[in-house]
Amino acid sequence: MLQNQEISKKEKYNIDKLQKRLRRNVGEAIADFNMIEEGDRIMVCLSGGKDSYTMLEILRNLQKSAPISFSLVAVNLDQKQPGFPEHILPAYLEQLGVEYKIVEENTYGIVKEKIPEGKTTCSLCSRLRRGILYRTATELGATKIALGHHRDDILQTLFLNMFYGGKMKGMPPKLMSDDGKHIVIRPLAYCREKDIERFSQAKGFPIIPCNLCGSQPNLQRQVIADMLRDWDKRYPGRIETMFSAMQNVVPSHLSDVNLFDFKGITHGSEVVDGGDLAFDREEIPLQPAGWQPEEEDARLDELRLNVVEVK
């Protein structure tokens, strides 16, 4: 009995610690990119997956103690896929007392009509879904649209574009929508997928399967995801370092003439970003940048939280 109580205490401690880390990650992303401002009405796109559930939970948590006032409205798009459990999200959101809207649009029927059997339907489905969400945001008077993409999604997109698209382009934490009418934010931009997975399991979110449409998975994205997971296991810190690199771009040491004026360099030009080291190799840190062992991460989390609580 006593042993079970000790295990329960430890589990609760670990869940609390995990939630605090996710909360800190989301808070830092919001601050770094000015994602949420006074009076914002945030449309939280809820798919029924682990990422969007976690995003809603953390935003609700932050809302209680934030120095600014903002409101949340959860939106789910019921695409009329066979077997979609349409009762789950309304019941969950009503239990939470969260304002919500279920948008019913038969995009499934449109996609099935346009795309041959066995082909990936994600591209067309995504375009249709995007248009409906933009329209819904306008109808609800939302000032921001929050999507549940996390750090791993952002890195996957970067490598997909590098390997298959020939460009260095990731997934922005905050940007104007392609129709020029909405601001899209990704509050989970600094969050690790493995943290979200653990948090989702601990909270027991009522997960809705994402493959109800029967579409074939995006094999290219799956290959990239498997590669990153393998690197994370074999080379601790590599994922963190790559994400840090996305925040520390040096245009003068790349080859994009639109980002840096290489043609304008002449004798007498100033030295930029340390200049060219010719044959000398740049010193590389022994430890990956932006990474710290799990134990140290936990210790620093505790220290930061204590400081915040004292304040």
Curated annotation (Swiss-Prot):
Keywords: 4Fe-4S, ATP-binding, Cytoplasm, Iron, Iron-sulfur, Magnesium, Metal-binding, Nucleotide-binding, RNA-binding, Transferase, tRNA processing, tRNA-binding. It is found in: Cytoplasm. A motif (PP-loop motif) lies at residues 47-52. GO terms for biological process: tRNA thio-modification. Binds 1 [4Fe-4S] cluster per subunit. The cluster is chelated by three Cys residues, the fourth Fe has a free coordination site that may bind a sulfur atom transferred from the persulfide of IscS. Its EC number is 2.8.1.-. Pfam families: ATP_bind_3. GO terms for molecular function: 4 iron, 4 sulfur cluster binding; ATP binding; magnesium ion binding; sulfurtransferase activity; tRNA binding. Its cofactor is Mg(2+); [4Fe-4S] cluster. CDD domains: TtcA-like. Pathway: tRNA modification. GO terms for cellular component: cytoplasm. It is an enzyme of class 2 (transferase). It catalyses: cytidine(32) in tRNA + S-sulfanyl-L-cysteinyl-[cysteine desulfurase] + AH2 + ATP = 2-thiocytidine(32) in tRNA + L-cysteinyl-[cysteine desulfurase] + A + AMP + diphosphate + H(+). [4Fe-4S] cluster binds at C122, C125, C213. Transmembrane segments: none annotated. The thiolation reaction likely consists of two steps: a first activation step by ATP to form an adenylated intermediate of the target base of tRNA, and a second nucleophilic substitution step of the sulfur (S) atom supplied by the hydrosulfide attached to the Fe-S cluster. HAMAP family: TtcA. Catalyzes the ATP-dependent 2-thiolation of cytidine in position 32 of tRNA, to form 2-thiocytidine (s(2)C32). The sulfur atoms are provided by the cysteine/cysteine desulfurase (IscS) system. Homodimer. Belongs to the TtcA family. This is tRNA-cytidine(32) 2-sulfurtransferase. It comes from Klebsiella pneumoniae (strain 342).
